[in-house]
Regions:
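Active-site-adjacent beta->alpha loops and helix N-cap segments on the catalytic face
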Residues: 66-81, 97-101, 122-136, 188-198, ...
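Conserved N-terminal beta1-alpha1 strand-loop-helix module at the mouth
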Residues: 1-85, 252-269, 273
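A C-terminal functional module that forms or caps the active site or interfaces directly
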Residues: 187-235, 239-240
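Short, well-ordered coil/turn segments that N-cap beta-strands
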Residues: 13-17, 52-55, 84-86, 115, ...
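Acidic (Asp/Glu)-rich catalytic clusters
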Residues: 10-12, 47-53, 76-84, 130-135, ...
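C-terminal helical cap(s) of enzyme catalytic domains, especially alpha/beta-barrels
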Residues: 219-229, 242-277
Length: 277
């Protein structure tokens, strides 16, 4: 079960770090752009620099699909390069009518071989069930996301007084018969994160929004982890994979990425110590 693997890795590495692998050709260092396959070499270098402290990697499919077959080949090369013991998350946000979702689930869990996938819940149970039928995988349901537009719908009050994201949590708990559901909750929503954790029992949280989106790392650790200081994946993308500076060699780049990742994990460990006091 993926959740057990996540918690074992948290315990082993003393880290909640999930690295967002979102290769943007406008931001990739020049030294990679001179190579035959810039995306593959860039993402491999990020993995090489972070694999000792990262517990998960989350490629966002849009960054690869936008490049057509070249991007999909790069994604395939990345998947084969990832260490076997880390957790892999397809950030694809796919769900549809049952038969289509069944094929999406097959694609992400079997064809691509991911451990987890992000899905929107708003088409209801029949759009989610095909993912949940993979009992050993993890389905991460969008609950309260980090973008400013989330207020347009996720914070709408429903009849009866519940907010939409609260109804999503309620359904996630109801559907979680195989203990293979997690939630996506933004790091920049500290009070809501705290409240959702109190209600969510032991559900695993994927927490984006730290760094470039302004979320607090300390709050993400304090409020996102469960009572056992587990069940949280704190995603950091741009702030780690695009360190400042010009790089004359892959080694220089990897050292800079490793330094940024180390700084974040050190801050996670400190926040964990402080929250335990």
């Amino acid at each position: 079960m993926v959740k057990k693997r996540i918690n074992a890795l948290i315990e082993q590495k003393k880290s909640f770090l999930c690295v967002g692998l979102d290769p943007d050709v406008q931001k990739i260092p020049t030294l990679f752009l001179r190579m035959q396959d810039p995306i593959t070499e860039f993402t491999k270098s990020v993995v090489n620099a972070t694999s000792d402290i990262a517990i998960a990697y989350k490629p966002n499919f849009a960054f690869y699909e936008a490049l057509g077959l070249k991007g999909l080949h790069a994604l395939d090369a990345l998947i084969h390069h990832l260490p076997k013991n880390v957790v892999t998350i397809a950030d694809a946000k796919r769900a549809d009518i049952g038969n289509t979702s069944r094929l999406y689930a097959t694609a992400f869990f079997e064809t691509w071989g991911f451990d987890a996938v992000t899905v929107p819940p708003y088409m209801g149970y029949d759009s989610i069930e095909p993912f949940l039928s993979y009992k050993e995988k993890l389905t991460l349901i969008l609950c309260l996301t980090s973008n400013s537009g989330s207020r347009d719908f996720e914070e709408r009050r429903l009849e009866g007084g519940k907010l939409l994201y609260e109804a999503v949590l309620e359904k996630a708990l109801e559907w979680n018969q195989f203990e293979n559901i997690g939630l996506v909750v933004g790091a920049n929503r500290a009070e809501e994160l705290k409240r959702l954790r109190a209600l969510a029992q032991g559900l695993c949280f994927l927490i984006p929004g730290v760094g470039a989106q302004g979320g607090s790392l300390e709050d993400s650790v304090r409020y996102g982890a469960d009572a056992n200081a587990q069940s949280a994946l704190i995603n950091i993308g741009r702030a780690v994979i695009y360190p400042d500076g010009e790089f004359s060699s892959i080694d220089d780049f990897e050292k800079a990425v490793a330094k940024k990742a180390d700084e974040y994990v050190a801050a996670m460990r400190l926040a964990l110590e402080q929250s335990a006091v």
